[in-house]
Every structure is written in C-alpha cells, then in structure tokens.
C-alpha cells in the first residue's frame, strides 16, 4: 500500500497545488469550518443530538458507524505510516495552514500519520450513514459535506488528496 501511495505523489502534488491556488485569509476560515464538520468531537455531538432529538435507532447506528471508522482509522495509520505533506520534502513548495486553537492542533499533526484522513473517514461514516435511504435533498447535502471536508483537509495542507479519497 505504501508503494502505491508513493506512486500517487505526482497526482497528489498536482491536485494540492491546484486547490491551494484558492488560498486566502477568508478561504482559510471557510475551510476550517468545513474541517470542523469532520471533527470527531462534532460527530459525537451530532450523534448525541440525533439519538436524543430524532431517532434512537439511527443514533445507535451512527455510534456503531463512527466507532468502526475510528478504530479502523487508527489501525490503518499505524500500518501505513505515511507522513503528512508538510513533513514531506517533495511537498515543501506547498502551503500548510498553521492555526493555533481548537481546530488544528499542529503538535498532534506533526506526530500523527497522514493516511487515512480521520476527518474524511469520520465525515464519510457519519454523513454517509445519515443519507442512507433518505430523500434526494438530504443525500445531496450529506455528499456535499463529505466532499467539503475532504477538500478542506487538502486545502489546509494536512492531507494528500489520496488520503481523503481512499477513506471517505
């Protein structure tokens, strides 16, 4: 798998460079909001809200989905051991949005692996589960959130595109 990801580096670099051309102070803030939608903390709060305010069975289903995704994510990160783009010399020409605060913990990011993207996997498991069997409007919104979380992780420079594509 690591060799396959290595072969994807030219693709990853080209896509990251194209996405980061959108950069700016306002876009940084927008992308941080999209990233927050893939945070485990937000997913747990959403799960609790669904359980208590909407449907207990769906809340339990989301809990199982999130737990499974989080467990697999940690296991895969430890098996693949792919460094983050901002730690990869081949990607040194790209930007990395350094933010102090709750949303992006740079110390944690520097000591954790890139593949697979936990935010994208969380978004895929939660929003993907929520759209299952729903009306078209809900499906479109769920898919949009998943894609925006994936985009935000690449834009912020904390994941390669393949990290987000292969796990969402």
Feature names for model-found ranges:
Residues 46-47, 53, 88-168:
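Membrane-embedded catalytic cores of phosphoryl/pyrophosphoryl-handling enzymes
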């Amino acid at each position: 798998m690591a060799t396959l990801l290595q072969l994807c580096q030219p693709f990853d670099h080209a896509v990251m460079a194209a996405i980061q051309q959108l950069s700016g102070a306002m876009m940084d803030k927008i992308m941080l909001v999209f990233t927050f939608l893939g945070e485990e903390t937000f997913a747990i709060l959403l799960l609790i809200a669904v359980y208590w305010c909407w449907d207990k069975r769906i809340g339990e289903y989301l809990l199982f989905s999130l737990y499974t995704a989080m467990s697999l994510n940690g296991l895969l990160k430890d098996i693949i051991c792919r460094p983050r783009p901002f730690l990869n010399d081949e990607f040194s020409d790209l930007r990395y949005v350094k933010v102090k605060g709750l949303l992006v913990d740079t110390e944690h990011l520097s000591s954790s692996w890139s593949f697979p993207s936990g935010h994208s996997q969380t978004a895929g498991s939660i929003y993907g589960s929520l759209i299952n069997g729903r009306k078209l409007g809900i499906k479109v919104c769920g898919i949009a959130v998943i894609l925006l979380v994936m985009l935000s992780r690449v834009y912020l420079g904390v994941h390669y595109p393949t990290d987000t594509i292969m796990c969402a």
